[in-house]
Amino acid sequence: MQLKHLRTLLSPQDGAAKVTCMAWSQNNAKFAVCTVDRVVLLYDEHGERRDKFSTKPADMKYGRKSYMVKGMAFSPDSTKIAIGQTDNIIYVYKIGEDWGDKKVICNKFIQTSAVTCLQWPAEYVIVFGLAEGKVRLANTKTNKSSTIYGTESYVVALTTNCSGKGILSGHADGTIVRYFFDDEGSGESQGKLVNHPCPPYALAWATNSIVAAGCDRRIVAYGKEGHVLQTFDYSRDPQEREFTTAAASPGGQSVVLGSYDRLRVFNWSPRRSIWEEAKPKEIANLYTVTALAWKRDGSRLCAGTLCGGVEQFDCCLRRSIYKNKFELTYVGPSQVIVKNLSSGTRVVLKSHYGYEVEEVKILGKERYLVAHTSDTLLLGDLNTNRLSEIAWQGSGGNEKYFFENENVCMIFNAGELTLVEYGSNDSLGSVRTEFMNPHLISVRINERCQRGMEDNKKLAYLVDIKTIAIVDLIGGYNIGTISHESRVDWLELNETGHKLLFRDRKLRLHLYDIESCSKTMILNFCSYVQWVPGSDVLVAQNRNSLCVWYNIEAPERVTMSSIRGDVVGLERGGGKTEVMVTEGVTTVAYTLDEGLIEFGTAIDDGNYTRATAFLETLEMTPETEAMWKTLSKLALEARQLHTAERCFSALGHVAKARFLHETNEIADQVSREYGGEGTDFYQVRARLAMLEKNYKLAEMIFLEQNAVEEAMDMYQELHRWEECIAVAEAKGHPALEKLRRDYYQWLMDTQQEERAGELQESQGDGLAAISLYLKAGLPAKAARLVLTREELLANTELVEHITTALIKGELYERAGDLFEKIRNPQRALECYCKGNAFMKAVELARLAFPVEVVRLEEAWGDHLVQQKQLDAAINHYIEARCSIKAIEAALGARQWKKAIYILDLQDRNTASKYYPRVAQHYASLQEYEIAEELYTKGDRTKDAIDMYTQAGRWEQAHKLAMKCMRPEDVSVLYITQAQEMEKQGKYREAERLYVTVEEPDLAITMFKKHKLYDDMIRLVGKHHPDLLSDTHLHLGKELEAEGRLQEAEYHYLEAQEWKATVNMYRSSGLWEEAYRVAKAHGGANAHKHVAYLWAKSLGGEAAVRLLNKLGLLEATIDHAADNCSFEFAFELSRLAFKHKAPEIHLKYAMYLEDEGKFEEAEAEFIRAGKPKEAVLMFVHNQDWEAAQRVAEAHDPDSVAEVLVGQARGALEEKDFQKAEGLLLRAQRPGLALNYYKEAGLWSDALRICKDYVPGQLEALQEEYEREATKKGGRGVEGLVEQARQWEQAGEYSRAVDCYLKVRDSGSSGLMEKCWMKAAELSIKFLPPQRSLEVVRVVGPQLIGIGKHSAAAELYLNLDLVKEAIDAFIEGEEWNKAKRVAKELDPRYEDYVDQHYKEFLKNQGKVDSLVGVDVVAALDLYVEQGQWDKCIETATKQNYKILHKYVALYATHLIREGGYAQALALYVQHGAPANPQNFNIYKRIFTDMVSSPGTNNAEAYHSWADLRDVLFNLCENLVKSSEANSAAHEEFEMMLLISHYYATRSAAQSIKQLETVAARLSVSLLRHTQLLPADKAFYEAGTAAKEVGWENMAFIFLNRFLDLTDAIEEGTLDALDHSDFQDTDIPFEVPLPAKQHVPEAQREEVRDWVLTVSMDQRLEQVLPRDERGVYEASLVAASTGVRALPCLITGYPILRNKIEFKRPGKAANKDNWNKFLMAIKTSHSPVCQDVLKFISQWCGGLPSTSFSFQ
């Protein structure tokens, strides 16, 4: 360590002004200096002077300079300073935590001599030395001081060890004494340790030794037991003077001694175990060092001098900067200061064992410290300043550190996991595991304290991939092991360590309860899971569902909600918990129920104060009330009475709250007076017992304390007089008689005649008691009393009076007893019979009326049957000789033997129908013989056979069956038995059974199933010889598949399928077997093909050798070529048969030609010496160029043939010129001539003949003339030519006739030209009549070939306007037609328009038709189903047209089930008051109210649309002739209903309006004539159930179930209306045609209703209001007065009415204000829309500051 001067804190003076003492505070923030003036100066850690205060003398009369301060020390909490003074006193000053706080003396300790030195090592403990030689202890808590030990020598120095647990004092005689408060297990001795040569004014206690020095200028280091380790002798150094003071570093690794102008520094070397002197710090004019103080973190040393100066030095071995963020200052070998450069915070890292710190790392997001020493590992949390040091043997730096848990560091090394809790110097534990993944390890360290559990530390980790172990880290033992069937990929304990969650590779989530060791799968697909921080609430994701378990103790109760993305995290703060979900690019927060989370957690932890604080932040709702009740119960159980009082106050239980308040006052007073727990006081315990209605316990508590009066007062206050009197009797209380009188008087005053009668009876006054009993309506008690007293029986009037009362009260048995007692048997018997007291009646009848006994026995039996006592009834029926009833009773009572006994006594007809019932019982007991006998007696032998069949007793069944069954039934029986035999492996027996019943196919199937093929073939051959071959083939395939080839061969060959056998062996590579089979069974060439395939598989010379061996080489070459395996054929020919190559080339060429590979084929043809074949190939494919190239190169004789072929192709393409040239090149003009003739091209034929074959010219001309004559001389060209000749000759009429005769279907242009020419000639040169005829002929012909314009032009030339227009129309040239009509004959304009409309209609060109005829266009749109275009077009027309088509479209949509789109139409276009539209509006309303999924907040806009349309309709009706009609009233009612639905949807979007929504659902029940009744009652019932109105919910849901049954039955006749008497809920409603609620929800309701009715905790009555009628009824049944319904809830307005401008419209003020408040707090747009509508509907809102903006 080196000292570096930093600054001068206090400048020295010119003379002696000694700094007497100095001290650093424990928290390193304050430094105190006491000057010679007895003033304490206070500095901050940076050396700035911040404060000062003066010390005071023990007694002011001696003056301020009467003492010196000799010792000073800070308290461990750094808020106090102890000052030791020479005037025999120690003062303790409280200086506070902040600068400038007032300095107050809080302790003072007066001593018998001067204080010479002082230390404050521990809380409340100040150690100081006195001039008289004593070392004493001052306790600041008790303000007393005591002597630790005493010597006879002045105490010159006092110091402590590093931990402050030991003290060392130096005395003037050189003695050094050691004392331990706690030796920390070191075993070091106490007492006098060493005798130093001089007074050890400089005394320091380092880690490994004690350093002492004094005026002899020697420094001596002593060992732990006082032996000298080292001596540093400076006595011969003239520069050195005496050593005045010494200080050890806080780490104990360095010592500094002060002398004159010099500070000497010694450092301990751990490796050499000796002190090494560093270079001394010499400062001129420093003078004598009088005081030294070392900062607690070891980074600063301050020295005070004789002249009053204070110098500050920096102490450092070395410094380094870590990642430019932290400064590491090594102030000693075992101590490092880590400073955060950005925040300035510092942490002191120190080895408590003095080991040298080797390296410091800052890991885990720069929060955690890790440092190694030779034998330990240092860990720390920079944020919380929690540091740990554990024993750690060097492992080569291979450790892996995980800092995911804020409380624990996880260290993984060589397969071992070690856990270290920050702030603890022992490892929590270590386990073996190979899985070091933070997701596979979970540690919980006191994360959530629970009541009664102080320490809770648990670890869960993977032992292997499928095994989880759970360890209690406190006890170090295993508390659970979970073996799972698949790999675990995530696990985590809850914060209390009671539950473990884990997920496996199949994404299944499991919950393990550590206490019960039970494992539950709670989710079958889990992509995200996390515990909610600070609770046991669990959040997980299952595909598109968010799952929340608010109560993990009930894992089956999960709250699920739909989400559209992936959960990415949880955020908890600000009083809410949110689940963050990414939906696309956005993150959406889903809020959890904070009440369930916070309250549940507080209750689980037993933190009732936290639970109370949370509940006080909530509004009082049914849920909150339930929480208060739970808390009140738990608080009482835990005796937290103030919490319980608060709970009952919140619940409005005033009496209980007041009672607890008084109890708390008693407990608090007792606690104040006597201390301890006030709840243990007897009055408190008794009052708590009273609160729990345990009055006996309260009495016991009072009597234990002899508080008899208090016990009696308690009972009297509770009006429990009997108990009060019993206490008085037990304790002999003097007021006993008075109590009894008061009790009787009280009973009479409170009309408790029964109790008064009992009191009189107990006191012996019978008449008075009877009188009181009768007065109380208790004649039975009176009768009992009379029967016990003979003297009272004698009083006939009294007895008559009593019997009359008994009969009136239907107490017939007691009346009978009385009549029998007074000897009136007739009346007694009547009473017994009426009271069903048959035993007494029969006994009386036997004595008095024997004839009646039989009748009474039967009646007795009937009564017992009604009471379900069938067993008892049997004997009575036998006595009454009622056999049938006796049998029925015996059967009902399951008295089978009695039943058989009775049956055996009856005739056969009577007994036969009962025997089977008894037989069934014995069959169920497997007593088959008895059952058979009974079935037989009852003529039910078939049932006996069925019994034996079901029991597997086939022999008995068969024996019976043969007696009574048909053959087909026996067959079924046998087959069943055979199947049973087959299951048992008895195949032969099964076969015999199958064959016996002529079912051999079943036997065949059985043998096949069990692979007994020989038996199978045997049966097929015997029973199905025609299928034998197919069976062999099928078996062969199966055996081949199983690899049983020899057996397969047998079956294939038996099936004559040798090819299948060959293929089987081939595919298995057994070629010899294949060849053998082919040769033996395959005919002449089969073995050759197999040989070819075998050889091909071998290839090369091996193939040649094989084929030579088989003698099939040449044949195989041919076979290969024939099978297109040319490569193999060439290979074989090359190796053995070269002369076969041309033949193979030719076959190959032909193959290539077939494949279309002509160039390759050409080469092969040439190689085969067949060029002619190549030429023919190309000619065939008309590749003339290639054909000519090959012919010229290899076969010149074929050139002419190629040219002729090419010419033929040209002729086929009508290219006569090219064909002519080719034929002439081939020197074949004759062929050209023939081709022209065949084509009818006589002119070309004549030309060719003339040029190349002139000798044939004459004959050709003759032939041509013959042809012309055959065709009538009128070929097209001939006609045209003839026409031209007539025209040139001036014969225009004949020319016209010729032109008109031209018909050439191939040339419309020629025909047009000719016909136009004819018309032109006729107009120019022929008479008008003739020209008109020609034009009338030409016009239609031109139109026929599509030349409409030309025809029209012709017609116009002759003024044929209509014909011209018709031509344009037919040519669809409408503009020209219109122009002609307009310009030449306007009469035809309408004619053109009409045709144009028809054209557009026929063509479907509606867009064009719109401009001509809108209505026709709209109708066409409707026909085509183009509704959108129809409505869009109609919108541009008048209102009437628009709504005609809107109605048509709406009707269409409704038929298609699209009521929502129909509604949207009327939202867009308005709802006119047309009567013909009324059914549409009603249908939309009906469909909307019947549709599912509309009872939620999301349906608001649909309901609002319906409401707005009906409002618009009603407004229009008011202005129409339909105003105030029945239809108008009906639509007004529909408007009100739709307003209720819309308001309900709006209210469902806000939590605080849930009761409003429920009330609206209830109000809608009065409109069930217009709504589906089952849906309305279901919605009302579920809404009532959700808000806790269980009575209403039960009645409505019960009604709903009745309605669903009525729908099933198709009638409402069975409905019970008693629950709805005196309400406005209608009885007569339309029966819904179908169920509107799904089956699953109906069953859920059925279960709930059944559960509630079984509990019998609800009263089946609708709630009533102040009118005494059902609270939601508008009509008061008693008065008939009808209240207005509230616009917000639909409930009747009885008071606090807010009226609107529109008559009949009002709201309840409370509901209205609640609705407004909800809008203001939530800013809900839908609720604002409701208000906006109410404003429109009701003519404005009441005066309010609410705004829609």
Curated annotation (Swiss-Prot):
Record flagged with keyword Acetylation: yes
Modified residues (N-acetylmethionine): M1
Gene3D superfamilies assigned: 1.25.40.470, YVTN repeat-like/Quinoprotein amine dehydrogenase
GO cellular component: ciliary basal body; cilium; intraciliary transport particle B; motile cilium; sperm cytoplasmic droplet; sperm midpiece; sperm principal piece
Keyword DNA repair: no
Similarity annotation: Belongs to the IFT172 family.
Record protein name field: Intraflagellar transport protein 172 homolog
Native source organism of the sequence: Mus musculus
Gene responsible for this protein: Ift172
